[in-house]
């Protein structure tokens, strides 16, 4: 893989990983022109995006750790832990059962379309309720489950699934729902990436990798994800997610058309 392609894939990952539009759907299209991505490459560019969100929320994370004696912080941290543990336990069960859908265009396209419709419904439902900021135990449990659903069905979007489950379950405030979804995503994605990284090294999948290309992709992904998430957090203060939903539906229809015409697998 040449360095320009590595940088472009880093840009795509950085933009799409935490926006509710599915990084998988975009990367599968990019793969047609930029070449196949190795497992190691996927892990590295995702790690860059996770690092960006960790940097953005480092003060909030530090506050939760240092301020654990405060009831509000302790309660919030406990809900983050429960959501993470639900994802971890169910994730291990899914792995053991070997249930996994192929990352091919048609199922991803349908996940994009259905997810877009789901987002529109969630926005409509949330608008009919008071914009509560509270993260309830129900929200924490459902967010944990939503992360697994997103992992099992490529194209769902982890951020999209968790944000809109939180909104439907009672956290009508977009900023509060997004923050919880992103904070849960940090340990979840670090754990998943760490597991996949160890597995890749164990299987010899890191042999022959171009480490310069990996470094470029990682750095680009980190920088672009930082900018994208900062923009998203500012955007949702006064805007709905409807544009993202429409974009998902259009992209899903486009992918279906490409799959039907044989332009993409």
Curated annotation (Swiss-Prot):
Regions that span the bilayer: 38-58, 80-100, 107-127, 135-155, 175-195, 213-233, 244-264
Protein name, UniProt field: Undecaprenyl-diphosphatase
Localisation per UniProt entry: Cell inner membrane
Organism expressing this protein natively: Rhizobium etli (strain CIAT 652)
Keyword terms, alphabetized: Antibiotic resistance, Cell inner membrane, Cell membrane, Cell shape, Cell wall biogenesis/degradation, Hydrolase, Membrane, Peptidoglycan synthesis, Transmembrane, Transmembrane helix
Function: Catalyzes the dephosphorylation of undecaprenyl diphosphate (UPP). Confers resistance to bacitracin.
Keyword Transmembrane helix in annotation: yes
One GO biological process term: peptidoglycan biosynthetic process
Superkingdom to which the source organism belongs: Bacteria
DNA repair is among the record's keywords: no
Pfam families: BacA
Gene Ontology cellular component list: plasma membrane
Signal peptide: none
Entry's family note: Belongs to the UppP family.
Disulfide bonds: none
Note: Bacitracin is thought to be involved in the inhibition of peptidoglycan synthesis by sequestering undecaprenyl diphosphate, thereby reducing the pool of lipid carrier available.
Membrane topology: Multi-pass membrane protein
Any one Gene Ontology molecular-function term assigned to this protein's record: undecaprenyl-diphosphatase activity
InterPro entries cross-referenced by the UniProt entry: UppP
Catalytic activity: di-trans,octa-cis-undecaprenyl diphosphate + H2O = di-trans,octa-cis-undecaprenyl phosphate + phosphate + H(+)
């Amino acid at each position: 893989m040449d360095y320009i392609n590595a940088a472009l894939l880093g840009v795509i990952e950085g933009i799409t990983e935490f926006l509710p539009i599915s990084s998988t759907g975009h990367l599968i299209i990019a793969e047609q022109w930029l070449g196949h991505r190795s497992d190691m490459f996927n892990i590295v560019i995702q790690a860059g995006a996770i690092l960006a969100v960790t940097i953005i929320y480092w003060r909030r994370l530090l506050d939760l750790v240092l301020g654990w004696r405060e009831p509000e912080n302790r309660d919030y941290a406990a809900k983050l832990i429960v959501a993470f543990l639900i994802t971890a336990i169910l994730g291990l069960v899914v792995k053991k059962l070997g249930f996994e859908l192929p990352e091919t265009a048609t199922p991803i396209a349908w996940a994009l379309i259905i997810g877009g419709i789901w987002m529109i419904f969630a926005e409509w439902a949330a608008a009919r309720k008071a914009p509560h900021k509270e993260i309830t135990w129900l929200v924490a449990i459902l967010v944990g489950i939503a992360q697994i659903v997103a992992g099992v069905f490529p194209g769902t979007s982890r951020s999209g699934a968790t944000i809109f489950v939180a909104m439907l379950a009672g956290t009508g405030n977009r900023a509060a729902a997004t923050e919880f979804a992103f904070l849960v995503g940090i340990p979840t994605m670090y754990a998943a990436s760490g597991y996949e990284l160890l597995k890749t090294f164990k299987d010899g999948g890191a042999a022959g990798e171009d480490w310069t290309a990996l470094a470029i992709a990682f750095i680009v992904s980190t920088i672009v994800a930082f900018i994208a998430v900062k923009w998203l957090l500012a955007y949702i203060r006064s805007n709905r997610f409807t544009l993202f939903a429409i974009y998902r539906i259009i992209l899903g229809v486009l992918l279906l058309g490409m799959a039907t015409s044989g332009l993409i697998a």
